[in-house]
């Protein structure tokens, strides 16, 4: 049966959040804020099909899918996804597949798929209490950074992020980008795409029901962050930027933002490291409680649907 995909837009938000909220899925790919703000890059489409939430998108020029969201029998949807790919002449490709979904695919069609893990897209998930307190010996270096920021910049303020902060956020993103450097075309592409995603979030801030924080020193924005829930107990931090000239700004805003979140969120997803060595080192240094591995799934006969 053909799947009624349509371009994802804001009218899909309630349906996505309702269907993901009560699952145990903590994958940042299913955060509606991410799906919406990066749609320009992936041409993301959505469908409700046989009581399952389905996503279709483009990645590096290839047609791809996310794993179905729905706990009932996947035999009602997986064959239709295979047919959808075959109908358009595309090899079947499913990205960001967690181990739970990988098991369901195998149960649905035993021996039909094979999967490869891609460490670049592993989600780093942390215990909320650890990030909110930075307590203990393992996190002492982070605690020291945050406390140093307090000592060095006594005139700092932390406040919720609002749509009125958009210009300052864009300026700080540009400052951060220059500090990181644009060493190659791939890096430049990434930064420019990220800026576009940021702009899209800020323009639709209230509709997206996003949550964020702003750190200032003497009235100057030196860091900002924002995110949105994935499910009932996991909050996804989608973006965090700081002026590296202000020592400890990253550690301080990380801690302050987590402290401000509702207590029902006991896990904090800080997303992937994309294979960037410095980013990987930074995420590991906060000692995640879970590494959510994700897989690329294809059929054993690529052109078979």
Regions found by a protein language model. Give the residues of each.
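Short catalytic-loop micro-motif centered on adjacent basic/acidic residues
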Residues: 93-94, 159, 267-270
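Aromatic (often tryptophan-rich) hydrophobic motifs at membrane interfaces
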Residues: 209-300
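Conserved donor-binding loop and adjoining core beta-sheet/short helix segment
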Residues: 28-101, 216-244
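Conserved active-site alpha-helix within GNAT-family acetyltransferase domains
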Residues: 101-116, 144, 274-291
